[in-house]
UniProtKB/Swiss-Prot annotation:
Oligomeric form and interacting partners: Interacts with CHRNA4. Component of a complex containing at least CRELD2, MANF, MATN3 and PDIA4.
Gene3D superfamilies on file: Hormone Receptor, Insulin-like Growth Factor Receptor 1, Chain A, domain 2, Laminin
Pfam families documented for this protein: EGF_CA (PF07645)
GO molecular function terms listed in the Swiss-Prot or TrEMBL record: calcium ion binding; protein disulfide isomerase activity
Keywords for this protein: Calcium, Disulfide bond, EGF-like domain, Endoplasmic reticulum, Glycoprotein, Isomerase, Redox-active center, Repeat, Signal
Protein name: Protein disulfide isomerase Creld2
Top EC category: isomerase
High-level lineage: Eukaryota, Metazoa, Chordata, Craniata, Vertebrata
Primary localization class, coarse: endoplasmic reticulum
Organ and tissue specificity: Expressed in chondrocytes (at protein level).
Chain positions of motif CXXC: 29-32, 261-264
GO CC annotations, alphabetized: endoplasmic reticulum; extracellular space; Golgi apparatus
Organism of this sequence: Mus musculus (Mouse)
Gene field: Creld2
Length: 350
């Protein structure tokens, strides 16, 4: 029973935590390319080394040159895979003899290790500009796939269908045509350069707003150019009550009025059409009414204190007084002396 529990616990440790996204397993081509990149880096790191025995002339005469030696190959191979990288070590173990054969007898005839090992020997990858199981040429040819204006699906791998995924501004099976919002700056049978239209154009023949064939939404043709439509100048505002309209190129935005406004024409209390209760227009903008300073008392009960707050006021009995229906009545303990004056309530208590 204990063994079963231990096995189950070990299995749980191997499972990814809840919500974790499993990393995509590298393809055989990616694994091969990584191995070759590390091999080439190992060759660069050992390029200036020798046997290190102190008698280089004797060593090279007796053991052959370090440059082509098995000792150098061993040093390179030892640095190819981290001990924890199972897939790399598995690939290296399976293909160790192939790498040794290339090092010993094939390197001069096939100096490009990636092409010899990954493309022709393992058949895991294709050369750039080709794709699929048989390494066919990408659309537009292997030299400039997709006319240089896109990516070939599966380029350099044994996968994909060779179709073009065009860069922004380009379309068509060879990425040679321009999409809406772009115009042809330069074009021949194999090359195409598409450049962006002015922002006012949906389609165009050149870079300015006078070159528009169709105006973009939010723009209108005036004489020979597309110009911005000011939606905020319409007789009826496109915004709801409590908002004002701001025009932007090709569109508009609705912004909230200041909190003191009932309707507004722009930002801030100076642009209110009317003021909310408790505020009045003063020097062109809505300001708080101090009800406590008005000639007519705001607080009606006897002994009651008035405190102004933004947009309103509060009536509070002083310390030492208690509320009744029509007055603030002093309690026996609440007699006020000059040494013990009443204090106004804090802002938090209002």
């Amino acid at each position: 029973m204990h063994l079963l529990l231990a096995a189950a616990f070990g299995l749980l440790l191997l499972l990814p935590p809840p919500g974790a996204v499993a990393s995509r397993k590298p393809t055989m081509c990616q694994r091969c390319r990584t191995l070759v990149d590390k091999f080439n880096q190992g060759m660069a790191n050992t390029a200036r080394k020798n046997f290190g025995g102190g008698n280089t002339a004797w060593e090279e005469k007796t053991l052959s040159k370090y440059e082509f030696s098995e000792i150098r190959l061993l040093e390179i191979m030892e640095g190819l895979c981290d001990s924890s990288d199972f897939e790399c070590n598995q690939l290296l173990e399976q293909q160790e003899e192939q790498l040794e054969a290339w090092w010993q007898t094939l390197k001069k005839e096939h100096p490009n290790l990636f092409e010899w090992f990954c493309v022709h020997t393992l058949k895991a990858c294709c050369l750039p500009g080709t794709y699929g199981p048989d390494c066919q040429e990408c659309q537009g040819g292997s030299e400039r796939p997709c006319s240089g204006n896109g990516y070939c699906s599966g380029d350099g791998s044994r996968q994909g269908d060779g179709s073009c995924q065009c860069h922004t501004g380009y379309k068509g099976p060879l990425c040679i045509d321009c999409t809406d919002g772009f115009f042809s700056l330069q074009r021949n049978e194999t090359h195409s350069i598409c450049s962006a239209c002015d922002e006012s154009c949906k389609t165009c023949s050149g870079p300015s707003n006078k070159d528009c064939i169709q105006c973009e939404v939010g723009w209108a043709r005036v004489e020979d150019a597309c110009v911005d439509v000011d939606e905020c100048a319409a007789e009826t505002s496109p915004c709801s009550d409590g908002q004002y309209c701001e025009n932007v190129n090709g569109s508009y935005t609705c912004e909230d009025c200041d909190s003191t406004c009932v309707g507004c024409t722009g930002k801030g209390p100076a642009n209110c059409k009317e003021c909310i209760a408790g505020y009045t227009k003063e020097s062109g903008q809505c300001t708080d009414i101090d009800e406590c300073s008005l000639e007519e008392k705001a607080c009606k009960r006897k002994n009651e204190n008035c405190y102004n707050v933004p947009g309103s006021f509060v009536c509070v009995c002083p310390e030492g007084f208690e509320e009744t229906e029509d007055a603030c009545v002093q309690t026996a303990e609440g007699k006020v002396t000059e040494e013990n004056p009443t204090q106004p309530p804090s802002r938090e208590d209002l």
